UniProtKB/Swiss-Prot annotation:
Family statement: Belongs to the bacterial ribosomal protein bL36 family.
Statement: the UniProt record of this protein carries the keyword Transmembrane: no
MF annotations from Gene Ontology: structural constituent of ribosome
Stated name of the protein: Large ribosomal subunit protein bL36
Cystine bridges: none
Domain of life per record: Bacteria
Keyword entries, A-Z: Ribonucleoprotein, Ribosomal protein
SUPFAM superfamilies documented for this protein: Ribosomal protein L36 (SSF57840)
Any one GO biological process: translation
GO terms for cellular component: cytoplasm; ribonucleoprotein complex; ribosome
Entry-linked Pfam families: Ribosomal_L36
PROSITE patterns, A to Z: RIBOSOMAL_L36
Length: 37
């Protein structure tokens, strides 16, 4: 899980979602998981 000020999809499998008010990226590649904050 990377924590970044700005989250962007890194590949075609990345999805930007909102969970509990946080913007997150979920992906089939675990290296691409990101969270804002």
């Amino acid at each position: 899980m990377k924590v970044r000020p700005s989250v962007k999809p890194m590949c075609e499998h990345c999805k930007v979602i909102k969970r509990k008010g946080r913007v997150m990226v979920i992906c089939s590649n675990p290296k691409h998981k990101q969270r804002q904050g």
